[in-house]
């Protein structure tokens, strides 16, 4: 189902999703068990959506166990009934569980059908995802007023279940929650790329030592970029894309997240997916790096000159996406997926 964590939907889930989209159910609770998405419980409507909401949703929320809940509204769009997607990640749940559910969220939405999901609500306490909490969420979405400190904290957690902690004394960034620092060597390489002293930086996660380290800074031309993508392990890449556009010479920094699918362990896929947003936030916020485009690929063959150009200078702007999947050669691709970056809250999102 997804290369982000390797979690797949059971056949029962797929069948129930199909019936749910036709309006049969009011609520579905989905959990991860034995590396599969499974249905924990489901309910049929008994009243209007707002009268059903609290009595259906709140009893299903466990204090130490994340889950997903799909709650059907009474309204419809062109694709059918509209749904609320609730991501429940309680404060007292295990960090590994938080990471796993965060990294699998996009794949569940894709399996269900993103066009059916009207709103997404994230919660760490029941008040966040109660009917009152949902109405507050709707109000905050329609209001131009700035977020409160608590709302901003929840927004950041929604992006990923790990927080960023800047070490003032050590001058390196720490991914709190999974406690993966960026090595000084890697951080300095990113600074050099931002100052145009390098044109390529590759980072990897040293899983054993729990640190993001520098893997490669080889001077790289566009034609050589596919060769930099490992076939058996995940990597983060920052590439200075030098090109011309409408008569102007441009140097654009592109972020590439390469994940070769099931040749990587589930833990590796989970960690790379979970750490990605925080890494980008550090780079963009602390280094003031202007990352023009964020791309996810399965293999280096997808990085053609035409693809990079079209991604940096898209012909249509109907729907802006933080991460974009390349079209790639037929037969060489895994399942398509979209992943959101930190600069764009999951309003589009693995």
From Swiss-Prot:
Region annotated Disordered, chain positions: 316-350
Purpose: Actin-binding protein involved in motile and morphological processes. Inhibits actin polymerization, likely by sequestering G-actin. By capping the barbed ends of filaments, it also regulates motility. Seems to play an important role in clathrin-mediated endocytosis and distribution of endocytic organelles.
Name of the featured protein: Twinfilin-1
Post-translational modification Phosphothreonine, affected residues: 349
CDD domains in UniProt: ADF_Twf-C_like (cd11284), ADF_Twf-N_like (cd11285)
GO annotation (BP), single: negative regulation of actin filament polymerization
Keyword line: Acetylation, Actin-binding, Cytoplasm, Cytoskeleton, Disease variant, Phosphoprotein, Repeat
Domain ADF-H: 2-139, 175-313
Residues recorded as bearing Phosphoserine in the entry: 143, 277
Protein location: Cytoplasm; Cytoplasm, Cytoskeleton
Tissue: Expressed at high levels in the colon, testis, ovary, prostate and lung. Expressed at lower levels in the brain, bladder and heart. Not detected in liver.
Family classification: Belongs to the actin-binding proteins ADF family. Twinfilin subfamily.
GO molecular function, one term: actin filament binding
GO cellular component, one term: perinuclear region of cytoplasm
